[in-house]
Amino acid sequence: MSGLPPGVDPVRVLREVRWRRNQFLSLLETLCRAESPSLDPVAHHAVQALLADNLAALGYAVRRLPAPRSGVHLYARPRRRRRGAPLQLIVGHYDTVWPAGTLATMPFAI
């Protein structure tokens, strides 16, 4: 059992992930190096834009929803979605939590 929806070939998924490995790692590094302290919503704009652009490139319609204390929530859903198809909900945060300048002492490494 692969945990994938019916009709999704796990070998094809793995091949795609391997093919895009460097692209994924580059995005991960860019996100990890982005200064976005929790209490500085303005600093979140670059990360929001990066995530929104990448989601849009994958075929998602992206909306920015006002959030009283954190600036903006990103809401993304597939532009083309089959009725009754499986859905996923991904919840996370994109602030680095630490004060500005802290990331300089935390080098990115895999």
Which sequence ranges carry the predicted segments?
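Residues embedded in well-ordered beta-strands
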Residues: 29, 75, 87-89
